[in-house]
Structure formats: structure tokens, C-alpha cells
């Protein structure tokens, strides 16, 4: 079945972005690295819970239809410089490597990279030929998804100072800027 070519797309270096964001907050005395304890906050303070997949452990919101999923990717050595996708994807970095992926596993979310995941990725990325010696490293992460694949944002039904901003899954980097503005407008400007 062929593959599609991805043109004029951008890729966010999420690690670099998160590190720069953290440094900005540290520099502006707005970063705390303590374990969050709800008891330390008054009932008047507004709190936005953005916990990723760990929201499933939050007694305020764990009844909601969250469906975290572990995903795996591989970094391979390659000289192919064209991004491609056929449901799986291939993203070159321009310096002789590429990321390929990915998998979905709703059962073993904390297991890390697996041989089964590696084999699945290689099989699904059949639009490029991958030799074992090309594989440099396997990665895994947990998507904070929901059963219907839509984020869950809004106010708690009985505690109007607690808000939830979660469940973005694999589309978080592209949708969070839009939804964060909507959330701030809702909290600060009372816009729905």
C-alpha cells in the first residue's frame, strides 16, 4: 500500500522546549519542585491539574474516561531525508538519523521499550527498509489520552476552584496552545 510524503511540516523538539520553559520559570521565581500537596492550598486558590497520565491517581478526577497508552519509537541511522507516513511515521533529523514509530499499548503503560514494540515498528514502517544494525535506540513514553481521544478540560463539578487540563494524548504539542488560551479565558475572563 504506499506511503504519503509530509511536506511543510514542523517538529517541536519537546525536550528542548520543556527545558527552556522550566529555565524561564526558574529564572522568574515561578518554579517549585516540591511534591504537590493539596492540603497546603486554601479553598479560595484556583488550581489547574495538568498531570499527564498520572491523573488516573488523582481522586478528584480519576472517575473520568482516561485511557493512557504507552508508545514506543526507534531512533535509526539513515540517510533518507524525506519525512514519510503510512499510519506509522518516519521523521529524519537531517544529520543521519531518524525517529520512526509508533506503537499503542493500553495495558503495560510503564514497561519501557520492548522487543515486541521494536518488531511492530519495523513491520509497520514497511515503506523503508530497516536493518538491525541501523537501530540505535528505543524510546517509550506514556500518552495521557482519553477513551474518545478528546482532551478533558474544565472545572470540577463540586469544587469550583479546581480545574482539569488533561488527556491530550499524542496531539498535545499541537493542541495545547489553543486549549490553554481557552482555559485561561474561561478562568480569568469567564468566557465559555
Predicted regions and their residues:
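Flavin (FAD/FMN) cofactor-binding and adjacent substrate-gating region
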Residues: 1-28
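Generic recognition of long tandem-repeat/solenoid scaffolds
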Residues: 3-7, 100, 163-165
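A conserved short coil-to-beta-strand element within the FAD-binding core of flavoproteins
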Residues: 10, 29-44
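C-terminal catalytic lobe of FAD-dependent flavoproteins
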Residues: 20, 134-192
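Short, hydrophobic alpha-helical segments
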Residues: 25, 29, 129, 183-191
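Hydrophobic/aromatic beta-strand patches that form the interior of the parallel beta-sheet core
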Residues: 32, 48, 163-165
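Central helical "cap/lid" subdomain
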Residues: 45-84, 111-114, 130-133
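Active-site lid/adjacent beta-loop-alpha segment flanking the redox-cofactor pocket in flavoenzymes
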Residues: 79-159
